[in-house]
Amino acid sequence: AGLEEGSQEAGAYLAEHDNALLWAGRNRLAAAVKLLDYLNVDSQVGLLTDSCHNYVEQTREGWLHRKGSVSAGHQALVIPGSRGTLTYVCVPGRDTHISLDSISHGAGRKWARSICKSRIDRKYDRNSIRSTRYKSQVVCHDTNLLFAEAPEAYKNVEQVMEALQEYGLVDVIATLRPLITFKG
């Protein structure tokens, strides 16, 4: 099944889709400005990059759904790790055409959110779940979310980055170590 291109239903879906993307972008910007204000940093410093990782885009060849990936059309790409791993700042590599000009948004989940707490509940106490191997702090008031977003719930981002570089999809220009993680 699906939507017929040019139909009223497809038009309505795309309008809602575009509104959702606009809302998400503004929400990310508002969260960033709020954090910068909290840290007493000038929030007019400018935006380095902003990208969605779940959207539909019309290309010359047809419709492309990027789910968990971003467009290689950006000058800078941020490929986040978990709160316990590095985040990578990259530029698109020479061979992005082999992946429909799409780049992984991150390592991806290894476990469903619903099973995380039962798998690692005994590993952490009340305080250790709120810090990382980098000694960074996690700010979150929802215990279930703390477990659902634990580093163990994600695939190995270093292996993902090695593969992306091996296939010529990205060139890493910097890595970022988490200092503080906010979970809403």
Where are these regions (language model features)?
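Domain-length cofactor-binding catalytic modules of enzymes
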Residues: 1-184
